[in-house]
From Swiss-Prot:
PANTHER family from the UniProt entry: TRNA (GUANINE(37)-N1)-METHYLTRANSFERASE, TRNA METHYLTRANSFERASE
Oligomer and partners: Monomer.
GO biological process terms, semicolon-separated: mitochondrial tRNA methylation; tRNA N1-guanine methylation
Catalysed reactions, semicolon-separated: guanosine(37) in tRNA + S-adenosyl-L-methionine = N(1)-methylguanosine(37) in tRNA + S-adenosyl-L-homocysteine + H(+)
Organism: Aedes aegypti
Transit peptide segment: 1-41
Amino acids binding S-adenosyl-L-methionine: 243, 281-282, 340
GO molecular function per UniProt: tRNA (guanine(37)-N1)-methyltransferase activity
Disordered, as annotated region: 523-562
Transmembrane segments: none
Cell location: Mitochondrion matrix; Nucleus; Cytoplasm
Gene Ontology CC terms: mitochondrial matrix; nucleus
Protein name: tRNA (guanine(37)-N(1))-methyltransferase
This protein's UniProt keywords: Cytoplasm, Methyltransferase, Mitochondrion, Nucleus, S-adenosyl-L-methionine, Transferase, Transit peptide, tRNA processing
């Protein structure tokens, strides 16, 4: 029996005991209860194309029997669909699921005969199903291509449903928007994100697929009310759990400094619990909504709002706040700093390095930073997140690391992570920390040059080792005694050591004798060489004669003067 087999399945798998999951499983596995196959590929919604007729089992209960007791007995077998009532009290009719009940035998285990029912009370009647009887996921599964990924998920922000459709779903975008608006409770507008969030203010361009062009929303999260214009600010409903988790970390006397506060999902719940908060956001619309939400939740006395660049907020407000709290002897809490800007937050961590290097202050309280980032890759996401923080800080995270937590999966091989660590004295006061990441073309060339030098050193080392090995092998060969290989009957015998009584040659004596012969030969040649005769004196040149005549004339003049 199908029903008995299904009961065994639900007994072994407790998660199928939930009412919605059980009937959804049975509805989608029953061919009679899925939309007609003719709607596949529809791009313009035609609600009439979903109409179909099926035959379903029904119990006709006599009026004299206990109708409520019988309904309780068959509760797990009821046909549950959208806009359909399986139990009609006025007509005493109960519609059962066609997959669970095929014959009267499927109902015997319930004991309906003991309650006055017989096989004649079970009938099969025709009923009409249409567009209104299926949920949005059942409609879209029947319409969209089978061989491609369907619509996986969406987020609901107030009355707006936010989609992020992939390219192959764009031809069906208007149909998808209409179906979701019809089926999702409280939805008045459906929008699709056109581009990724890459601008300064973290908002994105959107396309209205269906509904009202009204982006002013109001919602409740972690016990607080938030009102804002969804088209001008950043909001992610999937981070609701993470917002609450960080707020729960705060203890009595702690304070929160929110660098990228947005409309206040971290700051306002913390302030509502009695903690002091400094909240900042660069987006003027986010700042305006932040101030409004503080007043809406009546926490404006415990929160101070700023409209600054995140780097300026760190260098100015956070710096002065850390100094003031370390000078305040009555402060005993922890300074928490949240940095929820996954795409850029890690790059701003370098601004904490040496933040207090010029301040003469005794540090007693070390702030705890909660920075968010995207870990991209197939490796361990915690190691990737830690590496991003260490790379941008320029120092390794040692004992000051508190926690690395997974937040959510953004895309395949892309996870959002939170790294919580303390700003130690080494980070805040040290002025010799060098960032490990290249900051200019020069540093890149220096790093490349160092790599080339190391490569040359390694190559030279390998050559030296090779030369030494060759020298050792040559020395071994010199020591070996030459032997003659003799073969006998084709077999090569092992070489034997050659022994001989050769007279030892004295090389030194031979060299001395050769030198003596060269000396004798040299003396003999020099002795027989004829002596050179002196050359006759050359006659005086004309120049010399003129000089002599000049001297004689001068001597004659001297005598005449005397």
């Amino acid at each position: 029996m199908l029903f008995r087999r299904f009961l065994n399945l639900t007994t072994k798998t407790p998660h199928l005991q939930t009412f919605r999951a059980r009937h959804y499983f049975r509805n989608m596995s029953c061919p009679e209860l899925i939309p007609p196959p003719t709607v596949r590929g529809m791009t313009v919604l035609d609600k009439g194309a979903f109409d179909k007729r099926i035959s379903a089992p029904r119990l006709i209960v006599p009026r004299q029997l206990n109708f409520q007791q019988i309904c309780s007995s068959v509760k797990k077998l009821l046909l549950k669909m959208e806009c359909f009532k399986p139990v009609v009290s006025g007509e005493y009719k109960i519609t059962l699921h066609p997959s669970a009940v095929k014959t009267w035998e499927d109902l015997k285990e319930i004991g309906l005969e003991d309650k006055g029912l017989t096989e004649e009370n079970l009938v099969w009647e025709q009923m009409k199903l249409g567009y209104d009887n299926w949920r949005y996921d059942e409609i879209l599964k029947a319409v969209l291509p089978e061989d491609k990924e369907a619509l996986s998920a969406f987020s609901k922000v107030g009355h707006i449903v936010h989609l992020n459709l992939k390219e192959h779903l764009l031809p069906y975008k208007n149909l998808i928007g209409t179906v979701i608006k019809d089926k999702v409770v409280g939805c008045r507008a459906v929008v699709n994100k056109l581009v990724t969030i890459d601008n300064t203010y973290r908002n994105f361009q959107m396309e209205l697929l269906c509904g009202e062009e009204d982006y002013q929303v109001s919602l409740k999260e972690n016990g607080c009310i938030f009102e804002f214009d969804f088209s001008k600010v950043y909001w992610n409903s999937r981070l609701s759990t993470e917002h609450g988790r960080v707020v729960e970390m705060l203890k009595k006397g702690d304070v929160l400094l929110d660098v990228y506060a947005g409309v206040g999902p971290f700051s306002i719940p913390a302030a509502k619990k009695g903690y002091s908060v400094l909240a900042n956001d660069l987006n003027p619309d986010s700042y305006k909504a932040l101030v409004h939400n503080c007043a809406k939740n009546k926490v404006q006395g415990r929160i101070t709002c700023f409209n600054k660049n995140g780097i300026d907020f760190i260098k100015e407000e956070i710096k002065q706040f850390i100094i003031s709290k370390n000078q305040d002897d009555t402060f005993t809490g922890t300074i928490h700093i949240t940095m929820n800007l996954p795409a850029l937050a890690v790059e701003h961590l370098e601004n904490y390095v040496g933040l207090l290097k010029d301040e003469q202050i005794e540090l007693k309280h070390f702030p705890l930073v909660h920075v968010y980032c995207f870990a991209k890759g197939v490796e361990d996401n915690k190691l990737l997140a830690r590496g991003l923080v260490e790379k941008n800080m320029g120092i390794p995270l040692g004992n000051n690391l508190k926690e690395i937590a997974f937040v959510r999966n953004v895309a395949p091989n892309k996870d959002m992570m939170r790294v919580s660590f303390y700003l130690t004295r080494q980070i805040l006061c040290h002025n010799d920390i060098q960032l490990k990441r290249p900051t200019s073309e020069t540093s890149h060339q220096d790093a490349k040059r160092k790599c080339n030098v190391l490569r040359k050193i390694a190559t030279m080392g390998k050559r030296n080792i090779k030369n030494r090995n060759q020298q050792k092998q040559t020395a071994k060969k010199v020591k070996n005694v030459f032997a003659v290989n003799q073969s006998k009957k084709g077999n090569v015998k092992k070489a034997k050591e050659v022994t001989s009584k050769l007279k030892k040659i004295n090389v030194q004596d031979k060299r001395e004798k050769a030198d003596k012969k060269f000396q004798d030969l040299h003396a003999h040649i020099v002795a027989k060489k004829p002596e050179k005769k002196p050359l006759p004196a050359k006659p005086a040149s004309k120049k010399n004669k003129n000089q002599a005549n000049t001297k004689q004339v001068e001597a004659g003049l001297d005598k005449m003067q005397m």
